[in-house]
């Protein structure tokens, strides 16, 4: 009996290491190169003002390697960012160490003079780590989203800015 238990123990350990089927399917769909469509950044200071900044990212390719846990962003043949990729669940991923993300995810030319200091403060507080909700993933469409509240101070004025960030990608 003891030998049977010892033989079955490694088998049971292997079975318990399997990922749930829905996570495996999401990893299969996510893995590979995704071509940028658009990023929309919505900055909101509740009760004061808000501004919506959609911009094209058709020159950007995001490579999600779910096997090795890496995320690489390429623009016109040049790597502009790289990070670790963590699969948190079938609907949440984390990108860790994408230190240049603000550079490629905001179009600075669309942000007015008042918004520039806000962007600079977001940049100063950004760690390169972000948790994304997967709003939609199919074989040819990916929509990622996060929202975050960031305290911002400009010339003595302080407000909690909400950043709602949505990325649209296609295979």
Segments from the language model and where they lie:
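Positively charged n-region of N-terminal signal peptides that target proteins for export
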Residues: 1-4
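Sec-dependent N-terminal signal peptides
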Residues: 7-8
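C-terminal motif of bacterial Sec signal peptides marking the signal peptidase cleavage site
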Residues: 14-16
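N-terminal helix-cap/turn-to-beta initiation motif at the start of protein domains
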Residues: 18-35
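Buried hydrophobic residues that stabilize the cores of well-folded domains
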Residues: 31-52, 101, 143-152
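Contiguous, well-ordered beta-strand patches that form the walls/edges
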Residues: 41-46, 59-139
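Short consensus segments that form the blades of beta-propeller domains
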Residues: 50-52, 122-123, 155-160
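Edge beta-strand at a domain terminus
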Residues: 139-171
């Amino acid at each position: 009996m003891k030998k049977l238990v010892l033989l079955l123990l490694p088998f049971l350990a292997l079975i318990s290491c399997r990922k749930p089927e829905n996570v495996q399917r999401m990893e299969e769909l996510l893995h590979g190169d995704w071509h940028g469509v658009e990023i929309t950044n919505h900055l909101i200071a509740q009760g004061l003002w808000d501004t919506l900044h959609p911009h094209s990212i058709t020159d950007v390719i995001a490579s999600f390697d779910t096997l090795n846990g890496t995320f690489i962003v390429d623009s016109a043949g040049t790597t502009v960012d790289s990070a670790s990729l963590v699969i948190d669940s079938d609907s949440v991923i984390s990108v860790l160490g994408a230190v240049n993300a603000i550079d490629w995810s905001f179009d600075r030319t669309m942000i007015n003079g008042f918004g520039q200091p806000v962007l600079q403060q977001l940049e100063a507080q950004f760690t390169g780590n972000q948790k994304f909700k997967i709003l939609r993933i199919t074989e040819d469409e990916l929509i990622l989203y996060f929202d975050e509240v960031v305290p911002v101070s400009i010339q003595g004025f302080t407000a909690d800015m909400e950043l709602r960030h949505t990325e649209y990608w296609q295979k």
